[in-house]
Amino acid sequence: MPVSTTTTKNGTLVIAGSGIASIAHITLETLSHIKESDRVYYIVGDPATEAFIQDNASGTCFDLTIFYDTNKVRYDSYVQMCEVMLRDVRAGHTVLGVFYGHPGVFVSPSHRAIAIARDEGYKARMLPGVSAEDYLFADLGFDPATHGCTSYEATDLLVRNKPLNASTHNIIWQVGGVGVGTMVFDNAKFHLLVDRLEKDFGPSHTVVHYIGAVLPQSITTMDKLTIADLRKDAVVKQFNPTSTFYIPPRDISLPLDTMAKKLGMDDASARPVSLYPPSRWTGTKFTTAPAYGPREKDVIAKIDTYAAPKDHKILHASRSMKKLMTDLALNPKLLEKYRANTKAVVEATEGLSAQEKAALNMDLAGPVHAVMKATPSDITDGREMSVDAVASATEPSAALILLLV
């Protein structure tokens, strides 16, 4: 069922993420809401990010970690965190909740708060952030599209006996909190996870212990271990609530030739398992395309004589158009005004062309995209789109980066 955007109440709730790396992972969108919200609630991973939020906020700030306590059930803390934000929403304030990482990934109070706010008739939305998994992809250097990827929370994996796939990448979250419902993290139940991993992969298979660096002074943890190593007390002591396991694929998943033929893919079994570069973590059985094989050398040789397609479009927009689009992206209050009275905002913006005004007044992505791009020949000849052509423009699909060559 689609979420209704029609509300009759003044309070609003936005939930955002601060990412993992201190300050650096805060998006421009999140920063704009920090600057403009009446109330900013946060639970972040380091004091530098906390200071950055407080220094940039124009409203009042509140640290939600106050609701944690050593032997207190975490669920109770989450309910309280959610409710204090909702109280300000109900009081008519613009409320921002900032959570460590991605606000919707392994975060309970964010989803609860948004659902309750919407049920009560308030505007509520979530902004994306950089999760531990995003950071892990970058640091460990693998693409989940190659081999596929499964992702589980450690305790849930065990309790619900979720399937692990030896032919895919596997990510296991919160390995330092197996069976823990409070704030006491002693790894007392960690051996149960090791039993499961040994059963599915064997004792000699690789597991990478990962923790993304937070402060500028922090060092990223990327420790390559075997599953057998996980039974050593000195190793177990290294795991904490921010620890994540990456388990690379052990087995090759062979192509189904009959399906490959139906898809028009010839010689599927001879294709490399992955594009260059080879994984740092998988074994030698996984073949990889060469960095400079015959095909690569051939296409590289064509770079200097390459000519762009005649229908290739480049950025072509007035200074006013570019500034207004930037402001709409980074100024929540202006965006709200634009959506409430589009024509007034457009008319108040000087320097727009007739086509740009027409596109903006339609408040549709397709026309806006169309008037901001043009072919070099159209620019040289002074050809402009007609208003009818602008109105009929549709939003182009994003370019696809295909896995197989």
Curated annotation (Swiss-Prot):
Binding site for S-adenosyl-L-methionine: Y100, H102, V105, A132, Q174, G212, S243, T244
A Pfam family this chain is assigned to: TP_methylase
GO molecular function, one term: methyltransferase activity
InterPro entries reported for this sequence: 4pyrrol_Mease, 4pyrrol_Methylase_sf, 4pyrrole_Mease_sub1
Keywords from the named record: Methylation, Methyltransferase, S-adenosyl-L-methionine, Transferase, Virulence
Family, per entry: In the N-terminal section; belongs to the precorrin methyltransferase family.
The protein's name in its UniProt record: Methyltransferase/ribosomally synthesized type I borosin cyclic peptide precursor pocMA
Species the sequence originates in: Porodaedalea chrysoloma
